[in-house]
């Protein structure tokens, strides 16, 4: 009998650092250089390994996504799934910037063909092709977004993919 890995392990949400790195990688903006100075800037393209945690600033992205407390020795991180995490993905400027960069990259990769651009975004965000039903839903979302505000609808689709369970969890 075939045993699928999803039968053996439950899906888990990405921790703060891998989630931030995945967002930057999806946009093609992750700086993979090793070494060098750390930074306090969440908007830096450096891997999260190089983002310093200020002990006095516990109201940040990492804390929202269950980062370890730097003031204590902990054997494991607490895991939570709470509304502020979804609100962060919906509203934070970093996610918006990543979605815009992804949309721009998709336009360069498949400039005229909407279906190819949808496929490009799915591959970049989810590492797979969309199903025919997902392609139709994405096409409808693009039409609705274009009618609603008249702007470029592609960042909206990119943002939807970045906010979905499939992006923020690991099977």
Language model segments and positions:
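An acidic, gly/pro-interrupted, aromatic-rich
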Residues: 1, 6-125, 129, 161-171
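Amphipathic alpha-helical segments that form the core helices of the histone-fold
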Residues: 136-147
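Globin-like tetrapyrrole-binding proteins
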Residues: 157
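Short, charged, surface-exposed loops that flank catalytic or proteolytic processing sites
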Residues: 112-114, 146-153
């Amino acid at each position: 009998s075939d045993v699928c890995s999803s039968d053996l392990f439950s899906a888990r949400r990405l921790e703060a650092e891998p989630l931030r790195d995945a967002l930057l990688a999806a946009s093609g903006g992750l700086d993979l250089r090793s070494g060098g100075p750390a930074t306090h800037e969440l908007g830096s393209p450096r891997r999260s390994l190089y983002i310093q945690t200020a002990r006095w600033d516990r109201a940040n992205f990492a804390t929202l996504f269950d980062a370890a407390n730097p003031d204590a020795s902990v054997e494991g991180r607490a895991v939570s799934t709470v509304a502020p995490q979804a609100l962060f993905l919906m509203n934070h400027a970093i996610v918006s910037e990543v979605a815009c960069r992804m949309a721009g990259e998709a336009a360069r990769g498949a400039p005229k063909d909407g279906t190819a651009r949808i496929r490009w975004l799915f591959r970049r965000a989810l590492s797979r092709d969309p199903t025919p039903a997902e392609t139709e839903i994405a096409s409808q979302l693009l039409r609705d977004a274009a009618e609603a505000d008249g702007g470029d609808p592609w960042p909206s689709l990119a943002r939807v993919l970045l906010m979905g369970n499939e992006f923020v969890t690991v099977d």
